[in-house]
A protein has these predicted regions:
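Alpha-helical membrane segments of multi-pass proteins
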Residues: 1-191
Length: 191
């Protein structure tokens, strides 16, 4: 990948990035909008949670789609670290805060297979180990350089770090009563 110019006009508009974020936002809007009454009758519209979720989507895009991306790729390690910190610590938490616990619990009640899969993937040991392995993998010199050279690998790097971060934050920030956060003491050890 050649060095991208850093200007305020350099915003990524790749279909996979923009389309993926729009698809996630659409699914969320359908879940808390038209399908909310079917899934969780009587549940009011979660306006505050919708703002949190939108903030998570926007912060994700700002991390990977804004001029911060080429600045971090080619010029400033500091910008690269800001980008990764937003992907790992800001966006996933905002998305967690935006997930209505009641809708999650209804999903888990209706689909015990999904609850079982989430229980496994979001277990503190599995999620913490998965995040650590993915983060470490992408920061080995060979893989880091490969991700810088290939836009596809670079997108895979960011997506894998984000997804494992989302899983890692579940034991801390879960909104579900059926898969609740771990107790405060273990949270301190986990972090």
């Amino acid at each position: 990948m050649s060095a991208s110019p850093v200007t305020l006009l350099h915003w990524h508009t790749e279909p996979a990035l923009v389309g993926g974020l729009l698809f996630v936002a659409w699914c969320y809007a359908m879940a808390i909008g038209p399908f909310r009454e079917y899934v969780a009758p009587g549940m009011p519209f979660p306006r505050k949670k919708a703002w949190w979720f939108a903030s998570g989507i926007i912060s994700f895009y700002l991390a990977v789609g804004s001029p911060l991306d080429p600045l971090g790729e080619n010029y400033l390690f500091f910008a690269h670290m800001i980008q990764h910190n937003v992907l790992m610590y800001v966006s996933p938490l905002f998305l967690h805060f935006g997930l209505p616990g009641r809708l999650l619990d209804e999903l888990f009640t209706r689909r015990p297979d999904i609850q079982a899969l989430c229980r496994l993937l979001f277990h503190p040991i599995v999620a913490g180990l998965g995040f650590t392995l993915v983060f470490s993998f992408w920061h080995f010199g060979t893989f880091y350089e490969a991700a810088i050279q290939s836009k596809t690998l670079h997108m895979a790097e960011h997506l894998s770090m984000f997804l494992t971060s989302f899983a890692m934050w579940w034991p801390i920030a879960s909104q579900s009563k059926r898969l609740p956060p771990i107790r405060y003491g273990p949270q301190m050890l986990f972090i």
